[in-house]
A protein has these predicted regions:
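Local sequence-structure signature of Cys/Sec-based thiol-disulfide redox active-site neighborhoods
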Residues: 1-22
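Structural alpha/beta surface segment adjacent to cysteine/selenocysteine redox centers
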Residues: 18-120
Length: 124
């Protein structure tokens, strides 16, 4: 049997939140179970000399409008009603991501994960 697909996430990524919201239907439809793996995106960007799409695409004509349209399409397609833009975005998630690793060691991954995502993207 092949290994479970991994879902790499950072609480600060709205796209990761939206993907997470779509995963239960994928798991139900396919019978696969995703393994959730925390990844500090800021660290990845720094280590690779890159920057977030929000920074690298800033100033491109019509990009914010297109992103908003695509987000709305995704929300409708996956029947996601819990998403709200975070007025504090972008957020430094270093402590949140360290916290989820610690919570996992303590057997508290699920409640920590749900609370962090809820307060980041459902009720910021």
């Amino acid at each position: 049997m092949s290994p479970n697909p991994q879902f790499l996430f950072d609480f600060g990524s709205p796209n990761a939140f939206l993907s997470h919201e779509a995963i239960p239907a994928i798991e139900k439809r396919t019978g696969v179970k995703f393994d959730y793996v925390p990844v500090l995106l800021g660290g990845v960007y720094k280590a690779t000399g890159n920057m977030s799409p929000g920074e690298s695409l800033r100033g491109i004509k019509n990009k914010p409008e297109y992103n908003a349209l695509e987000t709305e399409r995704f929300l409708r397609r996956h029947n996601i009603t819990t998403f709200k833009s975070n007025p504090f975005f972008p957020v430094n998630t270093l402590m949140l991501m360290r916290g989820v690793v610690a919570a996992d060691f303590e057997g508290l991954f699920e409640p920590y994960f749900r609370a962090a995502y809820h307060h980041m993207w459902s009720e910021p």
